[in-house]
Structure formats: structure tokens, C-alpha cells
């Protein structure tokens, strides 16, 4: 085992600072510990110009947005984590797969059904922090995305490894749009008396068309 993990709630709403899409052990220039590199990955289904965001985050004053949990129709984790979403006539399945003995997570999206042209947008929200800390907006973070084959790589701070984000679909497009997202609230940290608000940085988003029956791996 390489020691990396993915941890969140069943509806993909992080409630603790230990939650993240990709958490892995690091050492070397950094103190030896687990680090959250990818905090969240927000998916958006687009049809006829209408956007349906599958993500879910909690902010202050009990505000949840964008309420993507309402599209969840099935969840199964008996062998691997599988979530099925239904948005109108669209049925999208998401599966989490780990590469054995490597700190590599693959997320497979399969368009099970759709009655019209469908586009999928993936927006990574980056943390690059110790699992015991919280990320705050700052001017030192490098919000640029650097091209690599089939995707981009990001590294917010020196001393961290590069985070390679790639897609199996050759014609997928990455749109650079660096920006901070503010005040994600982790309610279980607040209940324990700890700081529970975090800012996450996005370097941009991936966008690609997906056909019925097609699978694309992130």
C-alpha cells in the first residue's frame, strides 16, 4: 500500500479537515505527515446550455451549495466506491479506482444514458496542506496550470510534489481560470472546538463532450 487515500461523506460534502479527494503521505522537504493535495473535484453536467452542478459544499449560516446531492440516485462501496447521478434524462456513474502500490487515484465517469448532447465539466479545488491545517487565500500560492500530455500539472507551493491531472479523452479541453473559493465550512471541526473554515484554489477546469455508453477517466 502506498498510503494515499480518498475520504469524504457519502454525498461528497467534506465535513472535516482530514477529508479530501486525494490525501497522501509526504516527507523530504516537508514534515513527514499526510497532506491534502486535492480537496474536492466538482462535476457539472451541461445540456442545451443549462448547467447542473453535482458538487456539494457547506458554507456559513448553514448554507449548502450547489446542492448536487439531490441528483444522487445510488451509492455503493462494497467493492469500489460507485455513485450514480440522475439529471433529467442523464444518468452518470462515477467510480473511484486506486492503482495498486501507487499514490494514483483514477475517477471513471460513464454516461449510462442521455437523450441529447452532453458535456461534462470537472473543476479541481486544490488545498496543498497538512491534514491538520487549513488552507487560507494568499498571494504565495501558484495558481497556474502547466500543460502535460492529456492534462495539466499544478503545484501551489515549493516543496510539494506536482499534482498531475489527466484525462483519458484526447480532445478534452482545460480552461485556465485561477481563482480562490472562500469559506468552506467543516462542521465537525467546529463542533470539536477547532477552526473549521477553509479557502481552496482552482487553477481552472476541464471540459469535454461525452456520449452515451462512453467512459472517461480522470
Please name every model-derived segment.
Residues 1-218:
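Terminal accessory carbohydrate-recognition/targeting modules of carbohydrate-active enzymes
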